[in-house]
Amino acid sequence: MRRNGYWFGCLLGAVMLLVGCQGTEEPLTTVEGLDWREETPVWSMVSTAPEDFGITYDDLTDLDGYPLDKLAAYCLGADGVFAEDGFDQLYCRFVEAPRTWVTYVSLLPEEEQKILCEHTALAAASWYADSNEFSESLDVLEKAYSSGAEEVVISMLRSEYENAAV
């Protein structure tokens, strides 16, 4: 009898422990009006030197798997057909994740910002004949960043886009 009481007590204790651990979980933050274009940057360093990423321009590489920081370094060091493919990918990355793109580019020196903005805007105006995604993204970004380094990059993009679209 005593043995059954021991096991019953153990079982009851385990059940109470499990039930107590399964309380209602509430989110740590509320998600009100979360922008669908919200992204989380994942770059590990800010460098635009192709050699920092082991980039060589010996043959055409598949740039789809390049993270944004490596792609930007690739574009800034490339010329000819290498640059064309790189800036095409850079435009696609902007459309996919405009906030991440702008945040990363805003960390770079002004000269490199200008190059990346110019070629990305040119791709939007020339190659893609503005599929409206670019313009809509710029509108959203201008509302989200009304000052700071990101605003400078967005203004640069808008200016380059308007010049290219003429």
Language model segments and positions:
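C-terminal motif of bacterial Sec signal peptides marking the signal peptidase cleavage site
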Residues: 17-20
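Non-catalytic all-alpha helical scaffold/repeat segments
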Residues: 25-166
